[in-house]
């Protein structure tokens, strides 16, 4: 798959205005009843790179992404996207889930639906589908795509908005190895073009390949956050060490 987006000048569709990064999260709490599933999360993300969010099951990774994206509201705490208004921030983000969310239409129509709201054209749609290796399936119903193809289409829909920040919630969890590498290549190309990536994964090998920095969550808190180059060889928290060594983290 070629990086057609980088080569096609028609694809500069990012929303105008001041950047929404850096991001500052302070004392973020999310409660369900009496249970704090996120408990005092404080986090800073700069304007570039790929942040991988890791941690054991139930540590709050997916919930944190949904809060940052604005799909959920915290019980308390602040999420500051460089002082931008929530509506402006939402327009500059995209979120891809583990299970692709697609229209029951053709592959091309799935892209057109997004582009119509953004003033895009057929040249942009063609470039997006070529970029994710689906140009030859433009007229096919999306429901007939394989799991890997469907996730690539979901990524193309996300990239159609030219997001400043791309959130990915375990997008390769149920895919075969070839599809995993294809998704990683698409995400890597987006990162290289300047899109800020926040990527949840349980796959340690994938995290090593993708991460510039790692946020490790444990019991709803940030147990560790630092450069990937230091985290993987020498994690500072006991929970992260156990996790990386394949031990059960409680």
Name each model-derived stretch.
Residues 69:
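Helix-to-loop junction immediately C-terminal to a conserved catalytic motif
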Residues 122-137:
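Conserved ABC ATPase "signature" region
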Residues 141-145, 149:
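Conserved ABC ATPase signature
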Residues 166-169:
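Catalytic Walker B motif of ABC-type/P-loop ATPase nucleotide-binding domains
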Residues 201-202:
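H-loop/switch region of ABC-family ATPase nucleotide-binding domains
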Residues 207-209:
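A short, surface-exposed alpha-helical micro-motif characterized by mixed small hydrophobic
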């Amino acid at each position: 798959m070629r990086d057609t987006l980088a080569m096609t000048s028609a694809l500069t569709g990012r929303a105008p205005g001041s950047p929404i990064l850096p991001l500052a999260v302070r004392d973020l709490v999310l409660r369900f009843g009496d249970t704090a599933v996120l408990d005092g999360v404080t986090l800073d993300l700069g304007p570039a790179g790929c942040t991988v969010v890791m941690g054991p099951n139930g540590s709050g990774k997916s919930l944190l992404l949904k809060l940052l994206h604005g799909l959920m509201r915290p019980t308390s705490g602040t999420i500051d996207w460089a002082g931008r208004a929530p509506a402006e921030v939402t327009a500059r983000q995209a979120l891809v889930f583990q299970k692709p969310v697609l229209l029951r239409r053709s592959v091309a129509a799935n892209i057109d639906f997004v582009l119509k709201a953004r003033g895009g054209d057929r040249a942009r749609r063609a470039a997006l589908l070529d970029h994710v290796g689906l140009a030859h399936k433009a007229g096919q119903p999306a429901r007939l795509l394989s799991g890997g193809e469907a996730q690539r289409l979901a990524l193309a829909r996300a990239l159609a908005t030219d997001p400043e920040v791309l959130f990915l919630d375990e997008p390769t969890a149920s895919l075969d190895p070839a599809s995993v590498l294809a998704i990683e290549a698409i995400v890597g190309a987006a990162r290289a073009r300047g899109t800020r990536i926040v990527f949840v994964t349980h796959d340690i090998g994938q995290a090593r390949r993708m991460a510039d920095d790692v946020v490790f969550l444990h019991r709803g808190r940030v147990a560790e956050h630092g450069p990937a180059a230091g985290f993987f060889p020498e994690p500072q928290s006991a929970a992260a060490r156990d996790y990386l060594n394949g031990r059960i983290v409680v």
